[in-house]
């Protein structure tokens, strides 16, 4: 057997080429994680702002729902019939008034940096609905029914002269609905 009495070469302690490539790759991955984390944080903030918009609407509707059947309720566009059965208040007139002349007029859809829009449905195929707000009319079914309520979107020509059960929904970035509140109006 041939033995070589030479000692192995001493290592310098410096990274070789493969080590350097690995460290560069690791640094790039770290930068990508921080960058994507920042993007996801901003998107989460947009969603939280949209939820706050929905909560502002829910708070206004809840407060107004306790007083709107009184004769001197303002705004008249959102007043209930009270004693007047001929009152023609509609949901569309109420929403239009609130978007133009109430404290809710300044709400902004942060996904698009535009004025908040009331939409009929959250649509996954139409991403312009992201951050929009939707209102559903919850109609209770008779006791003992398998389904406790029927959910219909509130349309502009729906009458609001009586009490309504309303669900406030906002749309997330992907067009999925997020329930914010259910209230009596």
PLM features: residue spans?
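Generic cytosolic/nucleocytoplasmic N-terminal low-complexity/intrinsically disordered segments
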Residues: 1-3, 52, 99, 104
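Amphipathic alpha-helical segments typified by the pilin-like N-terminal helix
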Residues: 11-60
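Intrinsic disorder/low-complexity segments enriched in polar/charged and small flexible residues
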Residues: 37, 59-62, 93, 137
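Catalytic toxin/effector domains delivered as secreted proteins or via bacterial secretion systems
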Residues: 50, 54-57, 64-67, 71, ...
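Extracellular/periplasmic head regions of type IV pilus-like filament subunits
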Residues: 69-185
